[in-house]
Amino acid sequence: MSRLFLEDGESVPVTAVSVCGNFVAGIKTKDKNGYNALLISKTEKSNNLNKSKSEFFKKINLNPGSLSEFKSDEIENYEIGKHLTAEVFEVGQYVDVTGTSKGKGYAGVIKRHNFSMQDATHGNSLAHRAHGSIGQCQTPGRVWKGKKMSGHMGNVKKTIQSLKIVDMDVENNVIYIKGAVPGFNGSELKIKPSNKK
């Protein structure tokens, strides 16, 4: 993350996100597909493209990349092969950002679910960071689904809603989003207009 200073001197924490290399790879219409949507390709190097995907990109004359679909009713101004730049966004707009969170490995309940530790003394033997009871008795005789326990932490799909675009560099196709976004440096993100703003 970085920070920007606004005109009134306020320091705002921002994440710089590059939006270059995005092309329209397909257009879905209500008549043909039942809904309106844009299929966007993010150009990336790949040595293991399957044949159907490589033929798809060859047919539309685009470099191969990852595909994402975005529902939109404003599809008239787009055509296959059009390069999407930072100009599709605007300063002050609120967006929802989806990405894969950083993987933390195997974690206990204190780190993973914010449990409290047990007593350090008073008869506690080797259970200081244990989660304690995980259920009842013979009824129901099982552990409920969704029980908070230790396990793999992170590396899951996460969406952060209503993040504000505070600035943009159209020349370099970079937008500056207020706050943090999921994932590590250089990871792929999906950005769309906010549902709640």
Question: What is each PLM-predicted segment?
Answer:
Residues M1-K197:
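Extended basic (Lys/Arg/His-rich) segments that typically form rRNA-contacting surfaces
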